[in-house]
Curated annotation (Swiss-Prot):
GO BP term, pick one: SOS response
Protein name: UvrABC system protein B
Family (UniProt): Belongs to the UvrB family.
Protein role: The UvrABC repair system catalyzes the recognition and processing of DNA lesions. A damage recognition complex composed of 2 UvrA and 2 UvrB subunits scans DNA for abnormalities. Upon binding of the UvrA(2)B(2) complex to a putative damaged site, the DNA wraps around one UvrB monomer. DNA wrap is dependent on ATP binding by UvrB and probably causes local melting of the DNA helix, facilitating insertion of UvrB beta-hairpin between the DNA strands. Then UvrB probes one DNA strand for the presence of a lesion.
Domain Helicase ATP-binding, residue spans: 35-421
Subunit details: Forms a heterotetramer with UvrA during the search for lesions. Interacts with UvrC in an incision complex.
A Pfam family per the record: UvrB
HAMAP family with a match to the protein in the record: UvrB (MF_00204)
Gene3D superfamilies the UniProt entry points to: P-loop containing nucleotide triphosphate hydrolases, UVR domain
Species whose genome carries this gene: Streptomyces coelicolor (strain ATCC BAA-471 / A3(2) / M145)
Keywords: ATP-binding, Cytoplasm, DNA damage, DNA excision, DNA repair, Excision nuclease, Nucleotide-binding, SOS response
Length: 712
């Protein structure tokens, strides 16, 4: 149910800012996609070959259509990459990022066979939580919004109407009782803290109130004269520098699950009623242990709700807080969008099945908890949308993939093709070779490539084979590395950077050489056991793997097989079809394929040096903190789209004295940003990591100046 709001959304045009113009197949694809959507087609498919610029095409399409857009990606890392690309292409519009805010999540579960109860355990990433709030804030206040999300967007997200109703509007000249205003901030889950000013808190100094919204990087200052708001301003939370003077601002709740006293009391009464009914049912079935367990757990939760307004696992009572009937769908991010929003599903061959699978996986775990007295039946209604419910809530959809699935193709009136690359690069030549003598042949091909300073990817079916092959190559003196699931994320980044930099020549892997790897130096992809049918050698998997050689002018794919399977035939035919079309286009237009030159980010080494320097500057306390913190979820930007980030804010305001920032607070910020810098690099977010590195360097310089001046 979409919320009814008095807020008038600001209207600014979507505008792509890029030094490049659409080229290759892009102009035709953009025009055709826009035409089909404007003609009212509900489902449109863009079949875009690897490296043809599908993200840029999507941005130009949004510019033509001028509609709020939700872009769904299959995982957090791809969502972060997309958000970065859209932010670069549409710098003047709100590009938001909405994924699960858990760095670590162990769901509550019960295993009847061993009578094992597993408690819920999780770690929340505060920056990702801020970005989630920023997304809903943008959707409610403006129309030029693109939200890049994972399947997290189909999970329950409080009650949008309650979220809007409890928002606090502030306008210069309006009258507000000061104490009543403070009570309203507390009601929407902001905490008063006059000592440590952090996100989600407010502080009071005489007639001045400062509040730090959970979705912003900048704080808000409210200056009052009696009961009248005299001035509103946006300021930097650390330095106190005024960034802008405002006439009107909105403060949204600090939680999407905000509930007023009346709603809370009604929910508690409903929970008590459901508990009584369920206990009677269990006792009739002779399940006395389950009844006792449920009584103890639920009465404790009810008492916690009455005393502090929340409890552990409060999301399991969301049906009662939302006032929904059993079985009805939850409110999700989709309900925050205006009615005419556009949905874009990236890598649709992966994402569409993922959306459909979410509900059953969640429900089977919760049914066990309900059956054994750990949860009330209403816990089953704290769930993601079912596929049918998801379809009811979306309007027009554009599916993007190099290998669209049967579902997308069956719903559209033929796919819009984007086969020609702006660089003129063509799909690699596919060569099928017999398995007899395959390793000797592969060694010969590797030697040919290394002589030309090119790189090779080798994909095997099993971990054992990959290990044995790597050992054999080492014996032959080939510079080789092995990429597998046991390699941690940061080391994986280093391996890919080292391959591109030429520190070694061959990378052996299993299923890690498909979507998301951008390696222009790779001229040969070798697929061993290509004729062994299964998930890793399906038509879709083979096309995706072939795409890894599509960024090199002399790219080739060698499939080692004794027979041509239907999957191989499909992949080879599709690759040849695209290749013929690309070669014909280049010939007709006099295009000379240009090698893709991408800067090799040596950010990993820089981060390691920055880490050592930070440790020397901050001492042993930093080392302990560093060891205690895990890698965070990928985040697409250091600062909010609307504010330009903390660094930009400082750049816009006048310089302040070094003494304006306490040394302890500065050291804490250096520590926090260094952790985020490492996390960004671990998720291949090199631009963010570089920006964070610059920020850390600036702060360390400031701290050293303070120490030299005897101020720290």
């Amino acid at each position: 149910m979409r919320p009814v709001s008095q807020i008038e959304r600001t209207v600014a045009p979507f505008e792509v800012v890029s030094p490049y113009q659409p080229s290759g197949d892009q102009p035709t694809a953009i025009a055709e996609l826009a035409r089909r959507v404007q003609a009212g087609e509900k489902d449109v498919v863009l079949l875009g070959a690897t490296g043809t610029g599908k993200s840029a095409t999507t941005a130009w399409m949004i510019e033509k259509l001028q509609r709020p857009t939700l872009v769904m990606a299959p995982n957090k890392t791809l969502a972060a990459q997309l958000a970065n690309e859209f932010r670069e292409l549409l710098p003047n519009n709100a590009v938001e990022y909405f994924v699960s805010y858990y760095d670590y999540y162990q769901p509550e579960a019960y295993v009847p066979q061993s009578d094992t109860y597993i408690e819920k355990d999780s770690s929340i990433n505060e920056e990702v939580e801020r970005l989630r709030h920023s997304a809903t804030n943008s959707l409610l206040t403006r129309r030029d919004v693109i939200v890049v999300a994972s399947v997290s967007c189909i999970y329950g997200l409080g009650t949008p109407q309650e979220y809007v109703d409890r928002m606090v509007p502030l306008r210069v000249g309006e009258e507000h009782d000061r104490d009543e205003l403070l009570r309203r901030f507390v009601d929407i889950q902001y905490t008063r803290n006059d000592m440590a000013f952090a996100r989600g808190t407010f502080r009071v100094r005489g007639d001045t109130i400062e509040i730090f919204p959970v979705y912003e990087e900048l704080a808000v200052r409210i200056e009052m004269f009696g009961d009248e708001i005299e001035a509103l301003s946006t300021l930097h939370p650390v330095t106190g520098e005024i960034i802008s003077e405002d006439q009107q601002l909105y403060v949204f709740p600090a939680s999407h699950y905000v509930a007023g006293p009346e709603r809370l009391e009604r929910a508690v009464n409903d929970i008590e009623k459901e508990l009584a009914e369920r206990l009677t049912e269990l006792e009739k079935q002779g399940k006395l242990l389950e009844a006792q367990r449920l009584r103890m757990r639920t009465t404790y939760d009810i008492e916690m709700l009455r005393q502090i307004g929340s409890c552990s696992g409060v999301e399991n009572y969301s049906m009662h807080f939302d006032g929904r009937s059993p079985g009805s769908p939850p409110n999700t991010l989709l309900d925050y969008f205006p009615d005419d929003f556009l949905l874009v599903i990236d890598e649709s061959h992966v994402t569409v099945p993922q959306i459909g699978a979410m509900y059953e996986g969640d429900a089977s775990r919760k049914r066990t908890l309900v059956d054994h007295g750990f949860r009330l039946p209403s816990a089953l209604d704290n769930r993601p949308l079912k596929w049918e419910e998801f379809q009811e809530r979306i309007g027009q959809t554009v599916y993007l993939s190099a290998t669209p699935g049967a579902y997308e193709l069956s719903r559209s009136d033929g796919a819009v093709e984007q086969i020609i690359r702006p660089t003129g690069l063509v799909d690699p030549e596919v060569v099928v070779k017999p398995t007899e003598g395959q390793i000797d042949d592969l060694v010969h091909e590797i030697r040919r490539r290394t002589e030309k300073d090119e790189r090779v990817l080798v994909t095997t079916l099993t971990k054992k084979m990959a290990e044995d092959l790597t050992d054999y190559f080492v014996e032959l003196g080939i510079q080789v590395r092995y990429l597998h699931s046991d390699v941690d994320t940061l080391r994986r980044v280093e391996l890919l950077r080292e391959l591109r930099a030429g520190e070694y020549d061959v990378l052996v892997g299993i299923n890690l050489l498909r979507e998301g790897l951008d390696l222009p130096e790779v001229s040969l992809v070798a697929i061993l056991d290509a004729d062994k049918e299964g998930f890793l050698r399906s038509g879709t998997s083979l096309i995706q793997t072939i795409g890894r050689a599509a960024r090199n002018v002399s790219g080739q794919v060698h499939m080692y097989a004794d027979k041509i399977t239907p999957a191989m035939e499909k992949a080879i035919d599709e690759t040849n079809r695209r290749r013929e079309k690309q070669v014909a286009f280049n010939k007709a237009n006099g295009v000379d394929p240009q090698p893709l030159r991408k800067k090799i980010n040596d950010i990993v080494a820089q981060i390691a040096r920055e880490d050592v320097d930070t440790e020397q500057l901050l001492g042993s306390g930093y080392r302990q903190t560093k060891e205690g913190k895990g890698a965070k979820a990928p985040v697409p930007a250091l600062g909010g789209q609307k504010t330009g980030g903390a660094k930009a804010a400082r750049g816009r305001a006048k310089e302040t004295a070094v003494t304006d920032r306490p040394a302890a607070e500065l050291a804490e910020q250096i520590e926090d940003l260094t952790t985020r810098m490492r996390a960004a690099a671990a998720d291949l977010q090199f631009e963010i990591a570089a920006r964070l590195r610059d920020e850390v360097s600036e702060m360390k310089k400031e701290l050293r100046q303070m120490r030299e001046a005897g101020l720290a």
